[in-house]
Each structure stands twice: as C-alpha cells, then as structure tokens.
Amino acid sequence: MATINQLVRKPRVKKVVKSNVPALQACPQKRGVCTRVYTTTPKKPNSALRKVCRIRLTNGFEVTSYIGGEGHNLQEHSVVLIRGGRVKDLPGVRYHTVRGALDCAGVKDRKQGRSKYGVKRPKA
C-alpha cells in the first residue's frame, strides 16, 4: 500500500485498454466498399478455403473481413456492413461482414441459426 506522500509524488497510472477492433472507432458496425473478394487458407492445423474480402470503410480504414455462411454474392464494389469479431485461424482478420445487410445477401436455404446469417423466417 502506497503512502499518501508517494501518491502525491507519483499518482497511480490507469491501465490503457487497447481495442481489438480499432477500425470501428467505438461504433457497433461500419459501412464499406469491397475492394477485393478472395479466398485464403487458415493456419495449421486447419485446412479450408475461407472466404474473405478487403474493405475500404467510410472512415478511410482498409480492413480484411470474413464472409460467414455457405455461398455469398459479394464482388468488387459491393457495399457491405462489418462488425467486430475475429477469425481465430485467419491471422489479420478481425472483422465479420453482416449477412443480409446492404449488398450482402443472406445465406440461401438456411433453416437454423438464421438471425446470424440474415435469413427471414420461412413460410410454414
């Protein structure tokens, strides 16, 4: 426990919390334009072709975002919404595209977990 005199001389230092998603600038989502849509391979021990896109955000940042779900309709110049959330086996991918918002369509024929993939409730 520090004495009052010690605290007067050198006050306690607040810990600075570093953001995991700096490009969002404390916003829940951001809009951007796809500059490149491509696939990439995950790091060991996983193996796949993960769908990702490079996005220029409205605030000028350029980020890589993961496209979740089976199949997508994104191409260059598509306008998308991104949210935070990294992909553990893709280094440098710290954002997810929001399915079913702006130019990004929802996942076709999705029956369960629909809200995460932008799919409306199917007709009975």
Curated annotation (Swiss-Prot):
GO terms for cellular component: small ribosomal subunit. Keywords: Methylation, Ribonucleoprotein, Ribosomal protein, RNA-binding, rRNA-binding, tRNA-binding. CDD domains: Ribosomal_S12. GO terms for molecular function: rRNA binding; structural constituent of ribosome; tRNA binding. One of its GO terms (biological process) is translation. The modification 3-methylthioaspartic acid is found at D89. Belongs to the universal ribosomal protein uS12 family. Part of the 30S ribosomal subunit. Contacts proteins S8 and S17. May interact with IF1 in the 30S initiation complex. With S4 and S5 plays an important role in translational accuracy. Interacts with and stabilizes bases of the 16S rRNA that are involved in tRNA selection in the A site and with the mRNA backbone. Located at the interface of the 30S and 50S subunits, it traverses the body of the 30S subunit contacting proteins on the other side and probably holding the rRNA structure together. The combined cluster of proteins S8, S12 and S17 appears to hold together the shoulder and platform of the 30S subunit. HAMAP family: Ribosomal_uS12_B. This is Small ribosomal subunit protein uS12.
